[in-house]
Amino acid sequence: MSIFTQEVSAINGQSGNIKQMLTLEMLPELKSLLSDSVEQQICIDGILTLWIDKTQLIPALRLLKTLPQPFDLLLDLFGVDERLRLDKDKLPAQDFTLVYQLCSINRNQDIRLKVALANDQAEIPSITAFWPSANWYEREAWDMFGIIFSDHPNLYRLLLPPTFKGHPLRKEFPCRATETEAFSLDDERLAIEQEALKFDPKRWGMEQSNKDNDYLFLNLGPNHPSVHGVFRIALQLDGEHIINSVPDIGYHHRGAEKIAERQTWHGFIPYTDRIDYLGGVMNNFPYILAIEQLANIQVSERVKCIRVMLAECFRILSHMLFFGTFAQDVGQLSPIFYLFIDREKLFGIIEAITGARMHPSWFRIGGLAQDLPKGWDTMMQEFVDEFPKKLDEYEVMVMQNSILKRRSIGIGQYNTQEALDWNITGAGLRATGLEWDLRKARPYSGYENYDFEVPTGHKGDAYDRCQLRVEEMRQSVKIIQQCINNMPEGEVKADHPLTTPPSQRSKHDIETLIQHFLNVSWGPVMPKGESCFAVEATKGVNAYTIISDGSNTSYRTRIRTPSFAHLQMIPKMAKGLMVADLIVILASIDFVMADVDR
């Protein structure tokens, strides 16, 4: 076994939000299996990273999933085009890399396996037999990089149209639309595109009929109000009962990961706001923390506290919308209007603090855009005093409604192991009874200093998933109250050469003005390395993996969103139920298509 340190700054850097660093010596079974052929890469995020041969991938993953304390969650799977990387001499020879990041809930540790692939041999076995959630991740890797997964059940386009040519995350694919042929949609092409989007049951292994009846195939979406976005589900029906279903995503795909390759590190912050467009600064959080971890930037306690307070405000905002739309989809129309009134009050506070409502882009590398305004605490305290009483009323109105209970209890039910197999995180996982919240398990930004509970369910059904988010709003209010009571003094921007200095300092000396000009116009040049940071976002685990080649832009930015993983489980949850039950299941997942498609 050889060990190489790709990130020199890792020795002095932070170790991410993983409590205990995993070593290969702690996994003797894996070490014995891989023998001397494995290469270990020391990464600044503290995740055990091993380069293995593709022939060892299946045995290694099988072993990791069946250990006494298994790595039972396939947190992420993605590709990297390494062909233009400047420091390839420190890496195994490859054109492409496939990255498998696994998480062990019992150990509270991650492991990252990397497989090197040549351009002319970009083929690797599928792992859908171990994790059904790998299906979409492998399809995405083929869609974006052209990597073939042998034995995959349906290796078709996922985020891009069936007629799309090329693989966008390859380095030879243009970053800008102006570098490609102008798009036009004449009648001939329109007919081709429409024909390509027709659902073919045979492609998905669906029978047209059984011995008694012909099946009905129904498109739910992509513009149905109950699918919460531009999203289609092709349903195979026997009367009103769902025999099978195929989610069809990608209509909202904007190429966020490709955009990150041409935007400066600072310039990409506003794009993160639009991933989960209901999450606000919650989207900035993992991206900023991953960069600060990479560059070893330390922020003040005041910055940490303000970030937590704003993140919890957006958690409440997101959950309020979920709560209202869940009731609306079940047929109860009043709650959403009451909740929108309270959302507007909180949006008013957000706007007073950040200058914007839904997409403030307020977090900065090394701090915040500005300090809190005068009177922020009074506004926030008024909301904290008033909202819990109203939430109690809304809970009685919605959760005690007999029709809602009959339509949601026992619907879309799954257990903890099924949730882990399908890469379910957030309230969807905690509804099964597993207390797994990164704010507690792997505290970041000072969350270890706050007193709050992690609500859990026990049935794992639609009703539990809704009830949990109600309880989470109460806990968020509790955290915000502690921020108000204990807001530290201090600067809101770190004194670091890679951060934008305060504007008042740039007016007093030319050196600071030069630094400000360079960081704003060209963007900061981050050190070489790889950094992954995950946070407990509004809908589940949101993680950013960034790869820096020592430039002012990212070489590769991977955005791991919870909604993408959660929609995969729809066919399993809906099978055997009725179309009306599917509407309840969709409402209980809590997703937005921008978070799915990126």
Swiss-Prot record:
It comes from the Bacteria. It is a peripheral membrane protein. The keyword Transcription does not apply. SUPFAM superfamilies: HydB/Nqo4-like, Nqo5-like. Residues 214-598 are annotated as: NADH dehydrogenase I subunit D. It holds the Pfam family Complex1_30kDa. HAMAP family: NDH1_NuoC, NDH1_NuoCD_1, NDH1_NuoD. In the N-terminal section; belongs to the complex I 30 kDa subunit family. In the C-terminal section; belongs to the complex I 49 kDa subunit family. NDH-1 shuttles electrons from NADH, via FMN and iron-sulfur (Fe-S) centers, to quinones in the respiratory chain. The immediate electron acceptor for the enzyme in this species is believed to be ubiquinone. Couples the redox reaction to proton translocation (for every two electrons transferred, four hydrogen ions are translocated across the cytoplasmic membrane), and thus conserves the redox energy in a proton gradient. NCBIfam families: NuoC_fam, NuoD, PRK06075.1, PRK11742.1. This is NADH-quinone oxidoreductase subunit C/D. It comes from Shewanella woodyi (strain ATCC 51908 / MS32). The lineage of its organism: Bacteria, Pseudomonadati, Pseudomonadota, Gammaproteobacteria, Alteromonadales.
